[in-house]
């Protein structure tokens, strides 16, 4: 029977171990371990000797061994539906900044708005023993699924449904769509198109409800042809806007997501020769670079993206922090933070063309 031995390339330095540190410091292995982990009594002289040796040898703890010993990994997972969405980039950055202040690393995953992909990634993160998860919207949102995941893992929902014992951070998308629709109604528009994700996702459902509420408040029936909702917001783009603008009874205003959908609507207005805001008014949901840099600048439904990320991280840190913080989090049960929206008026809205309200 042949045997296999693991060899190390002479160009690859051997990993410095705690035994090496103990030997260099002239102390026992147990003393070195207590000094490095601050886990027991160590004399000041021994502590300084161990610290000097660790620094001289560039010692770094083995994260796997450390995780097995402490039961924590120091890593948090974050899942979003579309990493290409610039709004997510700002949220992710805010989460990372807050976690790093407490010594946590973050691993980001992309679900591509797929329930199957989300479940695969959640399972992967759990097997990698992350300390907690932040989950953004996904294709099919089931509160019972989040309850199941959170039985043995700290979970924070971000703009998605969750059970009574769950925790989440949400933007008031109902109010955002309601105020956007009222803004256009006050200008005289009645044929207002809404382009968003559908009711399977919390943000889409709230926007549709807010839009309907504003129309009903004015005694206006909703033309269902003007409500374009899709399981994936990415499916809504140029072709949908082009179809709406080419219709005989076209909309005079749009409320649309301020990412790829906004780009599709702007492309459709150019192709059909409709000018913003002279022929078509436009409000985007979610503010960013494109709405501000486009000419004319696009009126937007805005909210504090950094606050979303920071709040999600804060809730998760309380849940996984251990000690008093963890006890308080469990005693309080589910926590919810709801953030408000505001209309940022710019140059993309005007009264409808004469005779086309």
Spans of model-derived segments:
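Bacterial carbohydrate/catabolite-sensing allosteric modules
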Residues: 1-12, 24, 56, 94-102, ...
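N-terminal helix-turn-helix DNA-binding module of bacterial transcription factors
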Residues: 1-72, 356-357
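Short beta-strand segments enriched in small/hydrophobic residues
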Residues: 24, 29-33, 68-84, 183, ...
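Amphipathic helical "hinge" segments at domain boundaries
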Residues: 44, 48, 57-124, 128-132, ...
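Short acidic active-site motifs
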Residues: 63-64, 117-121, 142-145, 236, ...
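Short catalytic-loop micro-motif centered on adjacent basic/acidic residues
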Residues: 107-109, 134-135, 194, 302
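Short beta->alpha connector loops
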Residues: 112-115, 136-141, 260
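Acidic, Gly/Pro-rich loop/turn segments at junctions of secondary structure
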Residues: 132-145, 157-165
